[in-house]
């Protein structure tokens, strides 16, 4: 068959025998969405979507709410961050199969009626869904769904543990245009939102809450924590919280003590803290100045005492930490910081508390993944399907919080799948690498009379076989739990 120039997309100059054209058969770059949908089924995402309030006239609904939620979550998980991407991917066979609530080959068939979905929902439809989910009731249910499904995964993977640790932190979420809640943050020096986020020591995202950009780090942290506590206690008998110095105020620490949480927080350096540790510090530095450690490694030393700030109602256990930074040309450099905890010594020595706190960096890495790899777009105005500005209505804070909550569901899908892969391969893997190696798989979609075959490339076939086996085993475990 002869070539037609109008079909040619690209012909490289380095090899004119190569010709690139658009596939006329059903080809997808997102076969991994089918794996994610399987994980979503096991975690009960369909049940969560069914619990959300849908105020549309159901006899006129073309795309069920469950399909709309799955569309947005799976697109985010696959790396499609803009709602507009749904229009470009409307006919992608793997995505149509993954988001549909219909079985068999029905998701790929032509619409039988005007109300039968044919392809993915359009950008305007997804935008209206997000507005519908922005009601206070739906946001509460979404937030509860994020937490409940994260805890369910942890229980399924680890059982009820003796103890768990979770981190609370905030981050700057850059925003542009006229949006409710966007404000200048002096610490981050940018116009942004200032959300709170909580992560478990297993890497699961527990909660996220949108806040105005100009609020203090600790603003409403008690209101953020309170709904989580009953659920977290189903996961572990003892719950530890790690927080940074921005949260270390007397009222919050007293409340954490009252609610039965073990906390470890960093304290801002101040003269009073330093004075208490002066003798220990001087003695330690005298010893260190005798010469570097025999193995050449930086040394550290801890010292603990009881301390109460003038603004606090009770004393806390403080651990002063001295860390050697460098030793060159006879000059010793060091760094000093302070931790506070309500844990008794029988629950952890100074070194134990320090080691536990240092894992906080892992939570910060998870935030980086959430922001950089999920990165939901927070639109400033409502747009038409063609992308032109329809009108200048600012998007409400509720709608932007929905964006973060849906991104949290997408993150936890990816993390649940990552945990399966890591357990099998015995090595850590980032979300970006997970997409590259597994999810962003090119495949040929072959439709038969009663079934659909997805043919992935040979380079990914072995890993797909492994993950398929793991998901089948996980599905059996879920069935046994529900039996």
Question: Which residues make up each language-model segment?
Answer:
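Acidic, metal-coordinating catalytic cores used for nucleic-acid/nucleotide bond scission
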Residues: 241-249, 269-271
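Structural preference for beta-strand elements that scaffold enzyme active sites
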Residues: 163-167, 238-242, 262-264
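Dynamic "connector" segments at or just before major functional cores
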Residues: 1-190, 194-216, 222-234, 259, ...
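An anionic, glycine-rich sequence signature occurring as long contiguous blocks
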Residues: 3-22, 262-371, 472-483
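Short, glycine/acidic-rich hinge or "gate" loops at secondary-structure transitions
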Residues: 87-88, 102-105, 239, 421-431
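Basic, amphipathic alpha-helical segments enriched in Lys/Arg and hydrophobic/aromatic residues
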Residues: 380-455, 463
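Short amphipathic alpha-helical "interface-anchor" segments enriched in bulky aromatics
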Residues: 39, 86, 349-395, 402, ...
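Short, surface-exposed basic-aromatic patches at helix termini and helix-loop junctions that form
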Residues: 253-262
